[in-house]
């Protein structure tokens, strides 16, 4: 009857009558597992794969062994009912250290909070530029020009998206192709509210043909302020988020930036007759009291202090599919 060999690394069945001094190839040592490496204490080979470890050929020859090794002896645990509970307690003093409570994330405030006008800081460069152009004082000459019905050759059409200029009486008869809505910049996409042809490229956005036909508007008194797009970008540090709007010669007395903890509304008047509007639903929460606006001759920087020092994934909070459906229904 064939018997099972219990030598480590063998595990074969053998005939006791044919058992010789070199019939078994086995490991006399013990398994060693260290730093993900597996091997036997009796030989140097090591491997990280357990199946490979099991297939390591023994390093010693001898007789097959049919005796099952004894199971490891479990330590005897003596209990006495007479011992009091105090005697069973450990003989050292216990120190229970309570872990600090985790820092709770700031709960997102309601978007319906009242809006506050951010402080405007006007740079010396902007003051000099406005004085030079006489835009801040509004001279009598400018007023007369605005009230005049005369249209100068080369005057640009005031309709949004129209790039035509006045070339004479024939321009009065031309059909103007323009955008009747306002430019919208949202989550990296740029489009007009009237036709919603979205693009991520600013130059492509500027080149979009209008969706409405009508008459050119050549004079300021007919057009009022002209809403135009402005290139803008943003960056952040650990504690602040800064938006840069590239609008030249902005007018502080006609511009305002208002915000609450999660919303930002930007209204900038620049170069006398141009307006830029942008409403932003902020990704994070800001400290309105510590936020401000810096106006220079070439751009406007909106510096918003973060309510908590964390990295924003984006400037704007993405809208949910439900909100997009509700907006499409409203439109």
Swiss-Prot record:
Residues the entry annotates as binding Zn(2+) 2: 27, 42-43, 59
Residue list for modification N-acetylalanine: 2
In-chain residues carrying the UniProt-annotated modification Phosphoserine: 51
SUPFAM superfamilies: HSP20-like chaperones
Domain CHORD: 5-64, 157-216
Observed phenotype of the null mutant: Results in centrosome amplification and lethality. Cells become polyploid or undergo apoptosis. Embryos are no longer detected after 3.5 dpc.
Pfam families from the UniProt entry: CHORD, CS
Compositionally biased spans, kind Basic and acidic residues: 64-82
Positions that bind Zn(2+) 1: 5, 10, 24, 64
Residues where Zn(2+) 4 binds: 179, 194-195, 211
InterPro entries, A to Z: CHORD_dom, CHRD1, CS_dom, HSP20-like_chaperone
Residues where Zn(2+) 3 binds: 157, 162, 176, 216
GO molecular-function terms, A-Z: ADP binding; ATP binding; Hsp90 protein binding; zinc ion binding
Signal peptide: none
Assembly information from the UniProt record: Interacts with HSP90AA1, HSP90AB1 and PPP5C. Interacts with ROCK1 and ROCK2.
The protein's name in its UniProt record: Cysteine and histidine-rich domain-containing protein 1
Protein's organism: Mus musculus
Taxon lineage: Eukaryota, Metazoa, Chordata, Craniata, Vertebrata
């Amino acid at each position: 009857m064939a018997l099972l060999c219990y030598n480590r690394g063998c595990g074969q069945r053998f005939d006791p009558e044919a058992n010789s001094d070199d019939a078994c190839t086995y490991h006399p040592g013990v398994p060693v597992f260290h730093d993900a490496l597996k091997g036997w204490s009796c030989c140097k080979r090591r491997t990280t794969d357990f199946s490979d470890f099991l297939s390591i050929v023994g390093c010693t020859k001898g007789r097959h062994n049919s005796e099952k090794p004894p199971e490891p002896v479990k330590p005897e645990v003596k209990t006495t009912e007479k011992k009091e509970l105090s005697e069973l307690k450990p003989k050292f003093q216990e120190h229970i250290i309570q872990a600090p409570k985790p820092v709770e994330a700031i709960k997102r405030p309601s978007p319906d909070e009242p809006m506050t006008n951010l402080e405007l800081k006007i740079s010396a460069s902007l003051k000099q530029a406005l004085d030079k152009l006489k835009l801040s004082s509004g001279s009598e000459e400018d007023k007369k020009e605005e009230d005049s019905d005369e249209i100068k050759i080369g005057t640009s059409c005031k309709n949004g998206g129209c790039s035509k200029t006045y070339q004479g009486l024939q321009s009065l008869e031309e059909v103007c192709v323009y955008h009747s809505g306002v430019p919208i910049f949202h989550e990296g996409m740029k489009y007009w509210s009237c036709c919603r042809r979205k693009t991520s490229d600013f130059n492509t956005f500027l080149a979009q043909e209008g969706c409405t036909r009508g008459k050119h508007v050549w004079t300021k008194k007919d057009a009022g302020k002209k809403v135009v797009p402005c290139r803008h970008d943003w960056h952040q540090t650990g504690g602040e988020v800064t938006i840069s709007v590239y609008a030249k010669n902005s007018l502080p007395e006609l511009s305002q930036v208002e915000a609450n903890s999660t919303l930002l509304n930007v209204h900038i008047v620049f170069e006398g007759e141009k307006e830029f509007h942008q409403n932003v639903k902020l990704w994070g929460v800001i400290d309105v009291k510590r936020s401000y606006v810096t106006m220079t001759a070439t751009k406007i920087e909106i510096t918003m202090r973060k309510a908590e020092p964390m990295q924003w994934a984006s400037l704007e909070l993405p809208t949910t599919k439900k909100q997009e459906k509700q907006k499409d229904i409203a439109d």
